[in-house]
Amino acid sequence: MGIQGGSVLFGLLLVLAVFCHSGNSLQCYSCPYPTTQCTMTTNCTSNLDSCLIAKAGSRVYYRCWKFEDCTFSRVSNQLSENELKYYCCKKNLCNFNEALKNGGTTLSKKTVLLLVIPFLVAAWSLHP
């Protein structure tokens, strides 16, 4: 591999490192009991990599959550709620009450890696 190929590979690895850098812990709104407006914040532990807001009737839950477990069955089971609307996100204090209006979930780091890896392979194979 020539110098140019090494530079391209180094640049791509640097981009991956930026995507995967964990930095400081995620900060979420987190209240021990359902409430309509949670103002308490917490720094999530490393295994809880997203913030959750879930609404079941008039009860609104705010927690740190494992993004991998952000599915209806896991959320409803953990909160003991049969019907709810939920939202998981990966930015500081993103689980505020208005977040439920946006709906859906954000991309996980694994998904980003799965999208980036084919580009790395293609860049590597294109270099003579």
Swiss-Prot record:
Cysteine pairs forming cystine bridges in this chain are: C28-C51, C31-C38, C44-C64, C70-C88, C89-C94
Q: Which SMART domains match?
A: LU
Modification after translation is described as: N- and O-glycosylated.
Q: Which residues form the signal peptide?
A: 1-25
Q: Specify the propeptide location in this chain.
A: 103-128
In terms of domain of life, where is this protein from?
Answer: Eukaryota
Question: Which residues carry attached sugars according to the database record?
Answer: N43
Ranges for the UPAR/Ly6 domain? 26-108
On whether Lipoprotein is a keyword of this UniProt record, the answer is yes
Q: What GO CC terms are in its UniProt record?
A: plasma membrane; side of membrane
Residues with lipidation of kind GPI-anchor amidated asparagine: N102
Assign the protein's first listed, main location to one coarse class.
membrane
Localized where?
A: Cell membrane; Secreted
In its UniProt record, which GO terms are filed under biological process?
negative regulation of activation of membrane attack complex
Q: Which PROSITE patterns match?
A: LY6_UPAR (PS00983)
Report how it sits in the membrane.
Lipid-anchor; GPI-anchor
Recall the GO molecular function terms of this protein's record.
complement binding
List the keywords (alphabetical). Cell membrane, Disulfide bond, Glycoprotein, GPI-anchor, Lipoprotein, Membrane, Secreted, Signal
| Annotated function | Potent inhibitor of the complement membrane attack complex (MAC) action, which protects self-cells from damage during complement activation. Acts by binding to the beta-haipins of C8 (C8A and C8B) components of the assembling MAC, forming an intermolecular beta-sheet that prevents incorporation of the multiple copies of C9 required for complete formation of the osmolytic pore.
- Could you describe the subunit structure of this protein? Interacts with T-cell surface antigen CD2.
What this protein is called in its record is: CD59 glycoprotein
